[in-house]
Amino acid sequence: MRRLLAGLAVGSFLVAASACGSSGGGGASDKNASSGGTTTVKVGVIPIVDVAPLYLGQQKGFFSKRGLKLSMTTAQGGAAIVPGVVSGQFQFGFSNMTSLMIAQSQNVPVKAVVNGVASTGVAGKDFGAITVKKGSPIKSAKELEGKKVAVNTLKNINETAVRESVRKAGGDPSKVKFVELAFDQMPAALDGGRIDAAMVVEPALATVKSQGATEIASSLVDVAKDLTVAMYFTSTQYEQKNPDVVKKFQEATAESLAYADAHPDEVRQAVTTYTKIPAATLAQVTLPKWPAEPNRASIEALEKLGAQDGLFKSTPDLDKLLP
């Protein structure tokens, strides 16, 4: 298992020490973290717009009224969060579906427990896109052949999505040169010409647009209609030992998703509490969708593309992985 986790983390956890939101205790179980009827749970998240409902739900008391207190810690991507959850560093984590399917294909004990975020399903109006700097001669995904394209994690959901955009545009994805960069480092790298294109998500997408960048493809839309991009998950051990905490987390997160979907202005404000997005750029952020349930058909499409890209050691069992 240790070897599997090391592989998932690609050599390092990449977990930032910055605790966003409420501060929490160590990596103890919920029993040890419980005080005065409140259970503190550590959640591994990514500092992107996707997780805004969790911060907003904490502010609105959706978790506290169920006896939960969230301690959020940021990481670069889902691939870094999976080992943290399985090892007990986090009780819950936010991860894209490809990372979860990769983990399960390696027999890592993960279980998705509640929906996370979905694409808007509208090309040109999604929260993630392939972008090129102002004045770039690149006009379509086909022209990314031989070019350097940044993704937040190699051999994962965004690389798969970019590959699909290149295929759909008539290009050869095997000729694209992928490089790994954190989302918040992409605007400067793109503007400085260190990369030719970047697959960015909000709020970094709004930042690159403010620098004059242009979208050339909505890769998440290219993968599948209304793609379920990510979900919140736990380890199978934690789910079995702490069913009450898992149920409370599911309920509070579901309430948070529904509230976020109906209150976009409050979502934008919540984003400022855990990212460095300038106030002037905030209004330009394209929000994703936060549906109550995952879209299984879209996850199956993502699974097929991941298999095509050679990401899985065995076929992921979606019946076991999904709630």
What residue ranges belong to the model's regions?
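C-terminal motif of bacterial Sec signal peptides marking the signal peptidase cleavage site
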Residues: 15-19
